């Protein structure tokens, strides 16, 4: 346990020489079970600065403490699991997410994921976990004879329901705790898109890419397009895409007309369809991230009022913007060890399951994310906030510096209120 005089130490991850990776950090000297306001403030700033935080030796952290940590990043959020319905009802059972999740009975915001048979864990009995395999989702697959040596990115995504209005806004963070991790093998992750791109990865890695880097490497023309475009997501997206297949890179779907027709989906409420900015602004650094869930996109709303409705065209546009950002040199493939607690900024990164396990290899993880209390800030939000600050300064209503923007002040007030 860290003493109350210990200050958490944030250390940027050491990436391989020549790597273009510039995100991720380790945290030491923090007690998650007894997290002080001071230490959480350090964690919060570190997360929005580094996007992925790794805290070692956290096997003792309870599901409740994991949930409380996760919600602390968005204290106004309702205690709802970020992906929405995961039950066995008609909606949940059709979702592509349904087979991969087991809910902890006494902490329903926390899910158990992994691979293999687990006799008992946290109130669950006889759990059969299934690590997603690209063969079930991609339009093409690696030969079975290469299954244990080669793999693919399963599905690049953001953790989000993407339907349900603001009540199901994308989670701010996701936390992952490694309970049991198979060791000993590495695999070659292949892109199979004609580029020859591949990446050496640890078995069962979680791969991360930075939405900020994905935006930064765009041309100026592409950046202007991304800043001014809004993405409309399909209603009930994980049911809608349930029969569709992915590109070999895991970055979006191929267009074969296999999406579930709108009339066959569960009831659609138009005001619950989410239309979000293509770029999301970091609440601490102000930087823009290219944040699109490529598998769930349906339409693009352009600055001039044009709506791109041809699904194949929509996907090609999004793929052209995102594909450079998943180049091998830009992917952080975390090498999991038992007890690793990873906190990642879900509004500033994309991530993917990777790997193919033998049936006997047991992998057990806890995942927690909570639907956001409000939608992410878009590119225009900073300008609006700066205009508001300027106007209020002129009227003598409030006096703040550029560094003390209104979103920051509001967040600070919320945190103090919760702590009290």
From Swiss-Prot:
Substrate binds at residue 366. GO terms for cellular component: cytosol. It comes from the Eukaryota. 2-oxoglutarate binds at residues 206, 336, 366. Keywords: Cytoplasm, Dioxygenase, Iron, Metal-binding, Oxidoreductase. Alpha-ketoglutarate-dependent xanthine dioxygenase is a non-heme mononuclear Fe(2+) enzyme that decarboxylates alpha-ketoglutarate to succinate and CO(2) while hydroxylating xanthine to generate uric acid. Allows xanthine utilization as a nitrogen source. Binds 1 Fe(2+) ion per subunit. Belongs to the TfdA dioxygenase family. It is an enzyme of class 1 (oxidoreductase). The keyword Oxidoreductase applies. Pfam families: TauD. The keyword Ligase does not apply. It comes from Neurospora crassa (strain ATCC 24698 / 74-OR23-1A / CBS 708.71 / DSM 1257 / FGSC 987). Fe cation binds at residues 157, 159, 351. It catalyses: xanthine + 2-oxoglutarate + O2 = urate + succinate + CO2. This is Alpha-ketoglutarate-dependent xanthine dioxygenase xan-1. Its cofactor is Fe(2+). It is found in: Cytoplasm, Cytosol. Its EC number is 1.14.11.48. One of its GO terms (molecular function) is alpha-ketoglutarate-dependent xanthine dioxygenase activity.
């Amino acid at each position: 346990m860290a003493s109350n005089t210990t200050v958490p130490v944030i250390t940027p991850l050491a990436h391989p020489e020549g790597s273009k990776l510039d995100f991720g950090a380790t945290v030491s000297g923090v007690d998650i079970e007894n997290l002080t306001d001071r230490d959480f403030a350090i964690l919060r700033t570190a997360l929005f600065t580094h996007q992925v935080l790794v805290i070692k030796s956290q096997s003792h952290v309870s599901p409740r403490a994991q949930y409380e940590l996760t919600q602390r990043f968005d204290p106004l959020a309702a205690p709802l699991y970020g992906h929405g319905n995961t039950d066995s009802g008609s909606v949940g059972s059709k979702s592509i997410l349904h087979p991969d999740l087991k809910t902890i009975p006494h902490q329903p915001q926390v899910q158990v994921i992994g691979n293999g048979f687990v006799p008992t864990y946290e109130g669950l009995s006889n759990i059969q976990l299934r690590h997603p395999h690209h063969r079930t989702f991609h339009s093409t697959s690696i030969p079975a004879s290469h299954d244990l040596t080669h793999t693919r990115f399963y599905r690049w995504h953001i953790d989000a329901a993407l339907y349900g209005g603001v009540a199901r806004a994308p989670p701010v963070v996701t936390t992952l705790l490694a309970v049991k991790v198979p060791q000993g093998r590495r695999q070659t992750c292949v892109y199979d898109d004609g580029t020859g791109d591949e990446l050496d990865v640890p078995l069962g890695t979680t791969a991360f890419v930075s939405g900020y880097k994905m935006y930064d490497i765009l041309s100026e023309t592409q950046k202007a397009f991304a800043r001014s475009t809004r993405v409309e997501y399909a209603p009930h997206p994980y049911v809608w895409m349930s029969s569709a297949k992915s590109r070999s890179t895991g970055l979006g779907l191929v267009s074969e007309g296999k999406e579930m027709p709108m009339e066959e989906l569960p009831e659609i409420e138009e005001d619950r369809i989410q239309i979000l900015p293509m770029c999301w602004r970091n609440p601490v650094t102000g930087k823009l991230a290219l944040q699109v869930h490529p598998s769930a996109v349906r339409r693009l709303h352009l600055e001039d009022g044009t709506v791109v409705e041809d699904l194949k065209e929509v996907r090609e546009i999004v793929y052209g913007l995102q594909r450079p950002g998943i180049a091998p040199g830009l992917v952080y493939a975390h090498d999991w060890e038992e007890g690793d607690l990873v906190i990642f900024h879900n509004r500033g990164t994309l991530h993917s399951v990777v790997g193919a396990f033998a049936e006997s290899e047991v992998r057990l993880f806890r995942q927690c994310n909570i639907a956001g209390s409000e939608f992410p800030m878009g590119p225009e939000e900073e300008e609006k906030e700066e205009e508001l600050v300027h106007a209020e300064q002129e009227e003598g209503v409030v006096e703040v510096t550029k560094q003390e923007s209104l979103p920051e002040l509001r967040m600070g007030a919320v945190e103090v209120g919760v702590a009290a």
